[in-house]
From Swiss-Prot:
Binds 1 Mg(2+) ion per subunit. Mg(2+) binds at residues 13, 40. Plays an important role in the de novo pathway of purine nucleotide biosynthesis. Catalyzes the first committed step in the biosynthesis of AMP from IMP. It comes from Nitrobacter winogradskyi (strain ATCC 25391 / DSM 10237 / CIP 104748 / NCIMB 11846 / Nb-255). Transmembrane segments: none annotated. This is Adenylosuccinate synthetase. The active site is at residues 13, 41. Substrate binds at residues 299-305. It is found in: Cytoplasm. Pfam families: Adenylsucc_synt (PF00709). GO terms for cellular component: cytoplasm. Its main location: cytoplasm. It catalyses: IMP + L-aspartate + GTP = N(6)-(1,2-dicarboxyethyl)-AMP + GDP + phosphate + 2 H(+).
C-alpha cells in the first residue's frame, strides 16, 4: 500500500478530475496542494456532472475526507459558492468531510482587480491568466504580507495585517489611477465571511501525519500541469506556483517520503490555454477537429484550448522533473478515425537537434518539432474497458508513447465516464 500523487504531465486540462475520482474510491483522503480556483475540472458520476475549481475531486464522495493544503491560495467567497453549489446538487459537504489548512493564503477582491489590471493593460505583456487573483495572492504570500485563514480568527491582529497589506496594494492602485481600498470596509467583509469558512480550518500537516500513521491512503491531487510550473514550465507563460510532484510535500506539510507513487496524466494529443510556446500546435482543420471532438473549452473560463499532436519530448521532460512512475493516458478516443497520426519525437533549434525544451523564452519560440508518422485506426476506442477492446493500431500507438517518454502507461481513459478506464497498474498497489 502506498500514497499516490497525481500531476498533469502537460499544460493542464489533461483529465485529472476523472482519474482522481476513479482513484478516490480507493483512497481515504484526497488533498489539493497548490493552485487556486483557476483550474477547473469536471466529474461525471452516475450521469451527474459536477464542475469543481477549488475543492478536491474527492469532495463529491462524502465518505472521503477532502483537504485543501497550505500550498493552495484560497478565495473564501469562491469556496462558499462552490460548497453551496454542491449542496444544491445533493452532495453532503461540511467540516466533517472537508478541511482547509489554517495557514492557507487568502485571495481577496483586490487580488482579482490587480490581476485584471495587469492583463488588460497591454496585449503585448499579457500572460493569459484567468484573472482570478492567483498570481497577486502568491506575490503577497512570498512578500510576507498575506492574510491567511487563521488570521480571521484573531480580531486583535487582523486590523494590523490589513493595514500592512494595503500599504502595498494602495500604492499600486494609486499608480494605476484607481480608488484605494478602505481598510475598514475590508475588515468588515472579512468579518462577515469568517463564520462561513473558519469551521473548516485545521492544522492540515498534523492531521495528515496522524492519518498516515493510522495507515490511511492519501491521494494528492495536483492542479494545472507540470509545464505550467513557475520554475520548470514555459516561463513566463506559467502559473504562479510549483505544479510538479514535489510540491505535494511542501503544499501539505508532509515529508517527501510520504508521497509514494507519482501518476502523471496526459492526453493522447496536446492542448494549451492562453499564451506561450506550443511546438506541435495545429492551426488548421485537424486542430479544429481535435478541439471539437475533445470539447476543448475551459471548465471555468470557457476559453478555447489550442490543440496539437502529442509531444513526447515535453512529456518525457515532465516524467523526469516530477519523478513520474506511470502515466494515465486520456482521450485516446478523440483520435479514432485518423488515417495517420503525428507524434513529436524531437526538436530542432536553429538547425541543430536538441533533446529537451530549452528554458529561454526566445529559444522556446524558435523550436521546430521533429515528427514521426504513426498509422491510425478506424475502429472505435470509445468506451473500451480492456486491452481486448482496443484496435491493434491504437495499442501500438500507446506502446510507442511509452517508448518515447520512458514511462509505462498505468491507466488508459477512453471516455469521460469513470467506468471507461483500462487499468494496467494500480498506483495504490505499486
Amino acid at each position: 500500500m502506498t500514497n499516490v500523487v497525481v500531476v498533469g504531465a502537460q499544460w493542464g486540462d489533461e483529465g485529472k478530475g476523472k482519474i482522481v475520482d476513479w482513484l478516490s474510491e480507493q483512497a481515504d483522503i484526497v488533498v489539493r496542494f497548490q493552485g487556486g480556483h483557476n483550474a477547473g475540472h469536471t466529474l461525471v458520476i452516475d450521469g451527474n456532472t459536477y464542475k469543481l475549481a477549488l475543492l478536491p475531486s474527492g469532495v463529491v464522495r462524502s465518505s472521503k475526507l477532502s483537504v485543501i493544503g497550505n500550498g493552495v491560495v484560497f478565495d473564501p467567497q469562491a469556496f462558499v459558492n462552490e460548497v453551496e453549489k454542491l449542496k444544491e446538487q445533493g452532495v453532503k459537504v461540511g467540516p466533517d468531510n472537508l478541511r482547509v489548512a489554517e495557514n492557507v493564503t487568502l485571495i481577496l477582491p483586490l487580488h482579482r482587480e490587480l490581476d485584471s489590471l495587469r492583463e488588460n493593460a497591454s496585449a503585448a505583456t499579457a500572460i493569459g491568466t484567468t484573472q482570478r487573483g492567483i498570481g497577486p495572492a502568491y506575490e503577497d504570500k512570498v512578500g510576507r504580507r498575506a492574510i491567511r485563514l487563521m488570521d480571521l480568527a484573531d480580531p486583535q491582529t487582523l486590523p494590523h495585517k490589513i493595514e500592512r497589506l494595503l500599504a502595498h496594494h494602495n500604492a499600486l492602485r494609486r499608480g494605476h489611477g484607481i480608488a484605494e481600498v478602505d481598510s475598514g470596509a475590508l475588515l468588515r467583509d472579512l468579518a462577515a465571511i469568517a463564520p462561513r469558512v473558519l469551521p473548516y480550518a485545521d492544522s492540515v500537516w498534523n492531521l495528515l501525519d496522524h492519518k498516515r500513521r493510522e495507515g490511511k491512503r492519501i491521494l494528492f491531487e495536483g492542479a494545472q500541469g507540470a509545464l505550467l510550473d513557475v520554475d520548470h514550465g514555459t516561463y513566463p507563460y506559467v502559473t504562479s506556483s510549483n505544479t510538479v510532484a514535489a510540491q505535494a510535500a511542501t503544499g501539505t506539510g508532509m515529508g517527501p517520503s510520504a508521497l509514494g507513487y507519482v501518476l502523471g496524466i496526459c492526453k493522447a494529443y496536446t492542448t494549451r490555454v492562453g499564451q506561450g510556446p506550443f511546438p506541435t500546435e495545429l492551426n488548421d482543420e485537424i486542430g479544429e477537429l481535435i478541439g471539437q471532438r475533445g470539447k476543448e473549452f475551459g471548465v471555468n473560463t470557457g476559453r478555447k484550448r489550442r490543440c496539437g499532436w502529442f509531444d513526447a519530448m515535453l512529456v518525457r521532460q515532465t516524467v523526469r522533473t516530477s519523478g513520474i512512475h506511470g502515466l494515465a493516458l486520456t482521450k485516446l478516443d478523440i483520435l479514432d478515425g485518423f488515417d495517420t497520426i503525428q507524434v513529436c519525437t524531437g526538436y530542432r533549434l536553429d538547425g541543430k537537434e536538441i533533446d529537451h525544451l530549452p528554458a529561454g523564452e526566445g529559444a522556446q519560440a524558435r523550436i521546430e518539432p521533429v515528427y514521426e508518422t504513426v498509422e491510425g485506426w478506424k475502429e472505435p476506442t470509445a468506451n473500451a474497458r480492456s486491452w481486448a477492446d482496443l484496435p491493434a493500431q491504437a495499442i501500438k500507438y500507446v506502446r510507442r508513447i511509452e517508448e518515447l517518454v520512458g514511462c509505462p502507461v498505468a491507466l488508459l481513459s477512453t471516455s469521460p465516464e469513470r467506468e471507461d478506464t483500462i487499468l494496467v497498474q494500480n498506483p495504490f498497489e505499486a
